[in-house]
Amino acid sequence: MKSKHNKEKKSGFSYKETLNLLKTDFSMRANSVIREPEIHEFWSRNKIDLELGSTNSGKNFTLHDGPPYANGSLHMGHALNKVLKDIINKYKTLQGFKVHFIPGWDCHGLPIELKVLQSLKSNERRNLDSLGLRKKATDYAKIQINNQLEGFKRWGIWGDWDNPYLTLKKNYESAQIGVFGKMFLNGYIYRGLKPVHWSPSSRTALAEAELEYPEEHFSKSIYVSLNITKLSDAVLLKLEEKDLRNKLLSSLNKLFIAIWTTTPWTIPGNEAVAINPRINYVFASDQNGNIYLFARDLISEICEKLDREFNVLLDVKGSLLEGLEYKHPTKNKFCNIVIGGDYITTESGTGIVHTAPGHGMDDFNVGQKYQLPITCIVDEKGNLNKHAEKFCGLNVLKDANDLIIEDLEKNNLLLLKENYKHRYPYDWRTKKPTIFRATEQWFASVEGFRSSALKAIEDVEWMPKTGKKRIYSMVVGRGDWCISRQRSWGVPIPVFYEKEGKGVLINTETINHIKSLFEEYGADVWWEWDEKKLLPEKYRNESDRWEKGLDTMDVWFDSGSSWAAVCEQREELQYPADLYLEGSDQHRGWFQSSLLTSVAVNNKPPYKTVLTHGFALDENGRKMSKSLGNVVDPNIIINGGPNQKIQPAYGADVLRLWVSSVDYSVDVPIGSNILKQLSDVYRKVRNTARYLLGNIHDYDPALEEIDIDQLPLLDQWMLNRLVEVSDEVTIAYENYEFSKFFQILQSFCVVDLSNFYLDIAKDRLYVSAKTQFRRRSCQFVMSRIVENLAVIISPVLCHMAEDIWQNIPYSTIEKSVFERRWPKFPESWLNPELNEHISNLRTLRVEINKAIEGCRTQQMIGAALETEVNYLPENEFFKNSLSWLDKFGNKEVDLYRDWLIVSDFNIVNNLSKDCLSIDNNELGKIQILKAKGLKCDRCWHYQNITVKGIENTKLCERCANIINL
């Protein structure tokens, strides 16, 4: 390059004007902050988004949107999720499917309620009634939805943004009442007293999906001794040895049951202790003469914990201990040992479980079996109530544990206290611990339709397949679903309670009436109207007898009803949906709640396929958090940060490219270094497209038809490779393996095009006469590449694809890339027989280029055209491929010297003595020599110059003919 410019300077004349140089308005820089919104405007103006998919003539494809929560700014999790969905929808649109994507939002629940309350002054909060709160919550949610909606649109996401589904809309709330009603009438919903996860900080019951388990939770665990007052009859029969029998009976004041618990505050609620009938237990005495009952397998651990030696007196099966009596540790009452289940193990503790039926599900089940009192000793705020007797008023998450432990210690019942690290449920919204608390709640009886749900899971395709095992095990093991919440911001449970008595009014008439009211007026009428207006006409005369319930439904019941409120209701969608796509945490959330409601109502799953993705982490694999300062903001990725040198504006397409680049089935990293790498890939693809566009500026395929058989071998291979790449990309999209698309795209643009085909094409494009076949044939191929490249990248790089399409220099039938259908090629383009020879020739080209580069590094030459190459083959495959090229190749294009971009190439039997370098490898001997002749000042090839150019420049015969000299 330098030598050419120097030569032209010396002569004072340049042939630049005679070359066919690149010409296009498609800029090297994306300028995405300005250009991408312009493209959105073009789509909107020409109805190239949602309406395009809706008017297709193919089959319906429904990707049902799992509703994000209408609170807070968009984050990388939103980006990963929504871009994945959009890639699929755009691909299906190009395939001709009817695609109508309805975005949705989850609008009810505590986080919005708390945001509203936090925005008010204390006196405003005190004066705010439920209806006022709902009005403010509605306004808040709509503002959040609008902010998120604009963000999604900026990412290039297509959807029915004018008609999204919102769980606060009247038609949605009405449909949800319909789902609840059908489940109730099918016998799957009931009201009962049961321990539920209770959040004292939120003052409401929580579902399993509303819990999180921080890694660093420590509980105050205690070992407690309970004084045995009476041995069971079975144990007495076991005591054949008279001395031992007498010893135990005479030592009842020193005979204890050893229990272990991590919730000391539940001790006042103790109604029994439970054992596993299959575990062996021992009565063992310590050095002080005290005798303790605990599991045999835990002797060593208990000795170490309590720092005591124990002597085993009696070994008994757990089943023999039933009925043994002990004195309650804090109350003046006596309780018994009962038979528990497999939840009692010897992994930790003593193998004997303190049982408070009002504060644990296993405890509750045992209590039901033995008809024990189901006593709740805690109020909704987490304070111990009158049933805790002397501890009444203490808070279970504050002072109750310490004072109860102190009382046990004072009464010589405390054996040990220590901190214990374990998984403990927290309220996912307030980030504070929860408790188990027995209250009257509404439940969905999963047991009633569990087998149907498990069968439905089998009928669904789960991607990845591990998702099936995950949700299957969850449904197998899950208890009844607590669906009632003690909050105002939600859809009310449509039930009326008898004021005087325990009657409950809910039936077909009341459900249908409430459903129709909500359809017309919305759920606010439940708080606005009195019972007389809410009840069906049949019951209005007795409205004084009833009062409406104030519980609302679990938000997972809200979103879990979306199949009924959206997919069943909208004609353009279908139920079951083709695809649900969300994060892997939704196996216990939306996937499961949707499955349970759909199966309970219609005995079928709401989806045909479920696809899951992982979470977005920082570059070091850590969870993003403000405290760590590692949060990556998608808005900053697109528009840049305050310091654009540190946080440049990459645009939405780089964000979308990131989504396509990762294995989203697992957690995925994102950060500044990754973004730089992605930006480089984006730039390479863009520059490849620019080169293609810039070299077809004077070409129109409609005016010049070229027969495939006329094309040079290189061009035939390139079209074959285009077909192969398109097929590979299609398979990647079909299988939702977008990272394969990313890899294929990189390889195609860099390896196949930039480093090979387009590198070789420079001489054809720049130097040839404008209409010369060697140039036109290349332009034909490039036009096919650029059009189809735009289409196959458009699901991911939608803005770049449209930008490419708008800069195609000739007329196209389609005004947008998205009006073009997915590529279909003439059969004649696919010619895999070319691959073996071309592959060999490319391999040889790489080795020769290495040798030339070695000479350049040692400053023996400047450009490759300053060399010629001698090749002595020692590999028949490569020799045959060169012969094939020589025999069948086009003499103006398929000369191997042109593929190498050297001035001459020779296959020799003997090497020259005078050379720059010799490389010897398994392909043969490669010799690099200085090119003979003089350099043509137009094409830079070294040849025997016979023509004197303008102002004493030198021209080869080819160039002289082209410019008519």
UniProtKB/Swiss-Prot annotation:
One example GO MF annotation: isoleucine-tRNA ligase activity
Keyword Nucleotide-binding: yes
Binding site for Zn(2+): C936, C939, C956, C959
A GO CC term attached to the entry: cytoplasm
Renumbered ranges of motif 'HIGH' region: 68-78
Cofactor: Zn(2+)
Cofactor: how and how many bound: Binds 1 zinc ion per subunit.
Superkingdom, taxonomy of origin: Bacteria
Broad class of the protein's primary localization: cytoplasm
Location(s), subcellular: Cytoplasm
NCBIfam families documented for this protein: ileS (TIGR00392)
HAMAP family named among the record's database cross-references: Ile_tRNA_synth_type1 (MF_02002)
Domains as described in the record: IleRS has two distinct active sites: one for aminoacylation and one for editing. The misactivated valine is translocated from the active site to the editing site, which sterically excludes the correctly activated isoleucine. The single editing site contains two valyl binding pockets, one specific for each substrate (Val-AMP or Val-tRNA(Ile)).
Family stated for the protein in its record: Belongs to the class-I aminoacyl-tRNA synthetase family. IleS type 1 subfamily.
This protein's name: Isoleucine--tRNA ligase
Species of origin: Prochlorococcus marinus subsp. pastoris (strain CCMP1986 / NIES-2087 / MED4)
